[in-house]
Amino acid sequence: MKAHINGIDVRYTVTGSGPWITLSHSLACRLEMWDEEVKHLSKNFTVLAYDSRGHGESGAPAVPYTLDMISDDIKGLLDHVGAMQTHWIGLSMGGVFGLHASLKYPGLFETLVLADTSSKLLPEGVQAFKDRVATVKASGMEAMVEPTLKRWFKDSFRAKSPNLMDKVGRWIRTTPLDGYIGCSAAIPTVDVTDRLHEITVPCMVMVGADDIAMPPVMAETLDRHLPESQLVVIPDAGHLSNLEQSGAFNSALARFYKHY
């Protein structure tokens, strides 16, 4: 399905019934990143998955993207589907978006799951985004496929998961150039560590133990500053922990949501 939200068409799916849960994917991915989570969560929840601005089959205008703009995308989509409040699961970029939207729209999220993400990037992380933007401007998205897979997944997992690597590689390769550039400019502007105390809903911070893109120290910072938080470190997982250790990721979600 698609809806015209905040000036762009947004592709989304709604599955199951019960309280709302919204799933927000990583940079250069798409809503299919959440297929396993949709399958599990839709037994007890109404699950909204969507392609973020600039990704998948959603609009990718060649304009500057901001976290405020993306928060408005989220609020507009939730209004469109009739979700007054939702649980939020965001991984990497999706976690950044969830943090910003929760501060811009207090009360919108009943809980937050923040996976492999951060409330503020280190200077070298900001520079890395600038370098990747320069690369795709010069050479296109194909130049991002192998470096991104290597950064996101451990070599041992890549070697035994060729079909998944092909799939994720296609997601990266087909991400609209303007969307990748736009979101890569917006993400590094996140700087909300000093405001995390304002997010008083229950949170679960998750991170792959071997994540080098958003390492565990960033998750520990989130967990330390959020008033009601629990930290789950997923062994033997890199950046896309829901794909590398699907069983452990979904078991943690099941424990977190058992009271909702």
Task: Tell what function each PLM region has.
Residues 99-104, 108-139:
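Flexible "cap/lid" loop of the alpha/beta hydrolase fold
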Residues 229-260:
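Catalytic active-site module of serine/aspartate enzymes centered on a nucleophile-bearing elbow/loop
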Residues 120-127, 139-197:
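Conserved alpha/beta-hydrolase catalytic His-Asp/Glu region
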Residues 8-60:
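Conserved HGGG/HGGXW glycine-rich cap/lid loop of the alpha/beta-hydrolase fold
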Residues 199, 205-207:
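Short beta-strand/loop motif that positions the catalytic acidic residue
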Residues 209-214:
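Acidic catalytic loop of the alpha/beta-hydrolase fold
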Residues 90, 94, 98:
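Gly/Ala-rich beta-loop-alpha elbow adjacent to hydrolase catalytic centers
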Residues 36-39, 48-89, 251:
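Active-site loop/oxyanion-hole signature of alpha/beta-hydrolase fold enzymes
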